C-alpha cells in the first residue's frame, strides 16, 4: 500500500523533469506560456450599444495596447448605467463605462458597494436639449411654454432643475412628454414635440440623418449654460481594484493610448467602431466622433490638466447641482467617487 505514494511521487518527478527538458529545448514555448500566465482577463461593459464615442477602447484593443499591458479585454453592453453599476457591484464584470452622475447617486444608497471611477472619459457631460428653431426655440429661455420629449431612461433630465434655476427658466412652464428612447428623434422630426432631452452627439446627428436641416436644430448643451457635470467614466469593481491594481493602471494607460490614436486617426477609429456594430453607418459615426471629441473630451480643462482626471472644486460644484434634484443622505466628497491613484502622471495624460 505504501508503494502507491512513492509511485505517484516518482511519476510527478518524471513529469516535472520532462517538462523542464521540453522548456529548455524550446525556450520560446516556455516564454509564451509564462507570458500567457501573466495576462489578466478583464470583463468590460459599456452602458449602452456601441457608438463612436467608444472608439478609444476599440483602438486600444486593435493596436495591441491592452495586450502590451498583459491584459485580455472582453467587451459587452449593459442596459444603461444603473445596470452596468449593478453588474460591477455583483462582480459579474470588472470594469465599466457609466455616467459618473449616476455613480454619485448610486453611492448614496445604504447598501451600495464602494465603487469608484478611475478615469473620466467625458470631461463635459453630453446632456442637451435638442430643439427645432422653426418652433421658436433658440436659447434655453425659449423652452417656456414648449413641450420637451424625454425618454424613460434619460439621465440628463435629472439635472434640468439645477439648469433651469441657474438660467432663470420657470421650470413649471416647460411641459415634458414621456416616451421610449426608440421614438425620441422620430417624434421630434415629425413635429409632435418642440424639443427632446438627450445627448448632444447622439440626438443631433440622428435628427440630421432623419432629414431635419442642420440650421433648424438648436443644440442647447447643458455645459454651455453652466452645468458643471462630468460625463462618462470608467469604474472598477472594488475587489478587482484591490487585488489587481496594476491591471487597472495598465487598462488606463492603454485607454489613453487608444484615445490619442483616435484623435490622430479618427477615420480609422470609426472604421473600427463600425466593424463592431450590427448596422453602423460610417458617415454618421464619423460625425458623432467629431462632435464628441470637440464638445466633451478635448476640452480646455483636459488640454491644461491632461486626460482622465477631475478638478475637485468643479466636482464639488457638480455635486451641488445634483443635490437640487436628489436628496443625499450624506453629500459625498470627490475622493468618495473618484480614485486618482490609477492615473499615470500628468505627462502621460497629455494629448499628443
Predicted features by range, described:
Residues 34-190, 194-201, 220-222, 227:
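Short, glycine-/small- and polar/acidic-enriched structural segments
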Residues 1-8:
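N-terminal secretory signal peptides that target proteins for export/translocation
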Residues 315-352:
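Conserved C-terminal helix/tail region of periplasmic/extracytoplasmic solute-binding proteins
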Residues 29-32:
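Boundary at the C-terminal end of the N-terminal hydrophobic targeting segment
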Residues 243-327:
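Secondary-structure end/capping motifs
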Residues 177, 183-187, 192-282:
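Pocket-lining segment of extracytoplasmic ligand-binding domains
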Residues 25-27:
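Bacterial signal peptide processing site
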Residues 11-23:
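Bacterial N-terminal signal peptides
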Amino acid at each position: 500500500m505504501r508503494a502507491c505514494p512513492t509511485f505517484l511521487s516518482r511519476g510527478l518527478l518524471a513529469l516535472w523533469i520532462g517538462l523542464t527538458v521540453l522548456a529548455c529545448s524550446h525556450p520560446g514555448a516556455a516564454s509564451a506560456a509564462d507570458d500567457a500566465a501573466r495576462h489578466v482577463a478583464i470583463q468590460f461593459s459599456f452602458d449602452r450599444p456601441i457608438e463612436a464615442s467608444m472608439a478609444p477602447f476599440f483602438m486600444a484593443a486593435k493596436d495591441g495596447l491592452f495586450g502590451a499591458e498583459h491584459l485580455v479585454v472582453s467587451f459587452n453592453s449593459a442596459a444603461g448605467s444603473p445596470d452596468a453599476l449593478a453588474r460591477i457591484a455583483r462582480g459579474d464584470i470588472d470594469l465599466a463605462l457609466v455616467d459618473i452622475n449616476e455613480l454619485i447617486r448610486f453611492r448614496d444608497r445604504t447598501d451600495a458597494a464602494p465603487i469608484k471611477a478611475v478615469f473620466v472619459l467625458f470631461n463635459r457631460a453630453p446632456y442637451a436639449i435638442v430643439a427645432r428653431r422653426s418652433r421658436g426655440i433658440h436659447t434655453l429661455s425659449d423652452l417656456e411654454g414648449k413641450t420637451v420629449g424625454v425618454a424613460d431612461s434619460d439621465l440628463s433630465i435629472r439635472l434640468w432643475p439645477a439648469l433651469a434655476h441657474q438660467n432663470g427658466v420657470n421650470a413649471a412652464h416647460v411641459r415634458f412628454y414621456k416616451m421610449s428612447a426608440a421614438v425620441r428623434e422620430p417624434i421630434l422630426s415629425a413635429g409632435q414635440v418642440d424639443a427632446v432631452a438627450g445627448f448632444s452627439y447622439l440626438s443631433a446627428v440622428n435628427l440630421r440623418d432623419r432629414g431635419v436641416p442642420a440650421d433648424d436644430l438648436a443644440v442647447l448643451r447643458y455645459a454651455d449654460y453652466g452645468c458643471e457635470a462630468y460625463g462618462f467614466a470608467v469604474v472598477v469593481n472594488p475587489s478587482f481594484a484591490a487585488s489587481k491594481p496594476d491591471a487597472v493602471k495598465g487598462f488606463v494607460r492603454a485607454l489613453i493610448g487608444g484615445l490619442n490614436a483616435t484623435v490622430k486617426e479618427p477615420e480609422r477609429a470609426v472604421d473600427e467602431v463600425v466593424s463592431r456594430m450590427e448596422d453602423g453607418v460610417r458617415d454618421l459615426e464619423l460625425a458623432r466622433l467629431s462632435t464628441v471629441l470637440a464638445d466633451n473630451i478635448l476640452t480646455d480643462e483636459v488640454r491644461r490638466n491632461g486626460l482622465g482626471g477631475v478638478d475637485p472644486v468643479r466636482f464639488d460644484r457638480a455635486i451641488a447641482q445634483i443635490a437640487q434634484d436628489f436628496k443625499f443622505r450624506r453629500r459625498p466628497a470627490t475622493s468618495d467617487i473618484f480614485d486618482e491613484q490609477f492615473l499615470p502622471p500628468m505627462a502621460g495624460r497629455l494629448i499628443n
